[in-house]
């Protein structure tokens, strides 16, 4: 998919809030995740996708697998940023309504769900 100059951002409703995809090319994706207070995304990992996040507003807990394989929990606030490498287990949980900017490789369907509050199961293909 190539960039479409002047195209509107695409809003995708999610059970935890919504995503606003503002860039989608064959090399990268840019989106804003709006996570409602008290909601969290799936505990997941990606087979191919590599992502970096920036907290634009709000406060969240980041669950992120470290180099030893242990999932650690860290509170992030506005201005904080992190890299989520390919294959690492992770989850975002909003303490308050949070706007998270995510820039990643373009594999939007590359999700291996390990746990989900909304009953979504399984693995999507990258």
What are these regions (language model features)?
Residues 48-66:
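Glycine- and acidic-residue-biased ligand/ion/polar-headgroup-sensing regions
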Residues 66-87:
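Short acidic-glycine-tyrosine-enriched beta hairpin
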Residues 6-13, 93-126:
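Double-stranded beta-helix
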Residues 7-50:
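A short glycine-rich, His/Asp/Glu-containing loop-to-beta-strand
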